[in-house]
């Protein structure tokens, strides 16, 4: 499955999803994901101001995987085109491979390697600290037991990360 993941990663890196300038549309990377998630019910939503999300569901999953697709702006100090993934020995280089197109590629490869229930929310508004995609998703009130957010955390599970949170609490007494 590594080669399939790297193939998807190469494609995902080729899409310019820098944020700013928030020029992401419902095409491009979202067309690629839609085309590579066969068997999923896919919904692409434009939330305005360059914030786009793709919600994909197959079956009746208990968990949702969330991945943002936007990247930080590139730098003039890149030694090669940042939108062309390069393999260097045991690593790959390209804009967004770590944060976090690599996780998106792995999820797409895993989804294609099985026919199990799965749910994904791909968003494009994380880098600008304008959580339109997540806020709109939370407003839908979909009943997942947990959401797993893909972020580079040095392979450590974390229970909180910068961003927004949503809590539903009940008190008695």
Segments (PLM) and residue ranges:
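N-terminal helical capping/dimerization or prosegment-like subdomains
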Residues: 1-75
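A generic structural signal for beta-strand entry/edge sites
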Residues: 51-53, 89-92, 164
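Short beta-strand-to-loop capping motifs
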Residues: 58, 171-173
